[in-house]
Amino acid sequence: MATTHLDVCAVVPAAGFGRRMQTECPKQYLSIGNQTILEHSVHALLAHPRVTRVVIAISPGDSRFAKLPLANHPQITVVDGGDERADSVLAGLKAAGDAQWVLVHDAARPCLHQDDLARLLALSETSRTGGILAAPVRDTMKRAEPGKNAIAHTVDRNGLWHALTPQFFPRELLHDCLTRALNEGATITDEASALEYCGFHPQLVEGRADNIKVTRPEDLALAEFYLTRTIHQENT
């Protein structure tokens, strides 16, 4: 059985640009209220007492991060990220010190709820593999014909989940799985897929569907609505 109540290091890959946002500014530096999306995402992690450090992987040419209050935060370490998400996560893991467990969270996912985070972190008490926040698929899913915008067939949504973040794993296990998957040319779309590639089966922890990732222009207003609602609920 896993050890309980260990301090956790979080890794936030923030070296991407996000061209689908159609802005010159990387999406993690767009503002919601008086903070950037990145700040909202990081503060949600640090709000939990078990998260004692956050490692943020930024682009080597990033000049925006140094202007944020996060740059001088005592619990934050900054490292150079890589060309791909997995490279940035590996750079973050190397800076995570001797942390036994690590969270990986999207820089552009600012609406994380504390109850979801707490339930995910509880996996360290029962699991040796870890798991991810995820939401059951609710919509009818269609598969397109190859190379066409035409329906091939309807996909059975039973058992389908939307993968969210944070994702939570033993540090050494995640490091080894990411390294092997990259060395063998596997397609890695999130951290859990690296563990899957190596034969592990992380847990699915149901999280709120409003834990959205800001990817397209219309997501910004939706994230602002969710954050404003959460702040209002916490203050009433």
UniProtKB/Swiss-Prot annotation:
UniProt-listed GO biological process terms: isopentenyl diphosphate biosynthetic process, methylerythritol 4-phosphate pathway
Origin organism is Escherichia coli (strain SMS-3-5 / SECEC)
Give the protein's biological function.
Catalyzes the formation of 4-diphosphocytidyl-2-C-methyl-D-erythritol from CTP and 2-C-methyl-D-erythritol 4-phosphate (MEP).
Q: Which family does it belong to?
A: Belongs to the IspD/TarI cytidylyltransferase family. IspD subfamily.
The record lists the lineage as: Bacteria, Pseudomonadati, Pseudomonadota, Gammaproteobacteria, Enterobacterales
Q: Which CDD domains match?
A: CDP-ME_synthetase
Q: Which EC number(s) does UniProt give?
A: 2.7.7.60
Give the catalytic activity. Answer: 2-C-methyl-D-erythritol 4-phosphate + CTP + H(+) = 4-CDP-2-C-methyl-D-erythritol + diphosphate
Q: What keywords are assigned to this protein?
A: Isoprene biosynthesis, Nucleotidyltransferase, Transferase
Site feature Positions MEP for the nucleophilic attack: at which residues?
A: R157, K213
Q: Which leading EC class covers this enzyme? A: transferase
Q: Which Pfam families match?
A: IspD (PF01128)
Does the record bear Transferase in its keywords? yes
Q: Which InterPro entries match?
A: IspD (IPR001228), IspD/TarI (IPR034683), IspD/TarI_cytidylyltransf_bact (IPR050088), ISPD_synthase_CS (IPR018294), Nucleotide-diphossugar_trans (IPR029044)
Name the record gives this protein: 2-C-methyl-D-erythritol 4-phosphate cytidylyltransferase
List the NCBIfam families hit by this protein, alphabetically. Answer: ispD
| Known pathway | Isoprenoid biosynthesis; isopentenyl diphosphate biosynthesis via DXP pathway; isopentenyl diphosphate from 1-deoxy-D-xylulose 5-phosphate: step 2/6
Annotated site (Transition state stabilizer): R20, K27
Q: Which gene encodes it?
A: ispD
SUBUNIT field: Homodimer.
Question: Per its UniProt record, what PROSITE patterns does this chain match?
Answer: ISPD
Q: Which GO terms describe its molecular function?
A: 2-C-methyl-D-erythritol 4-phosphate cytidylyltransferase activity
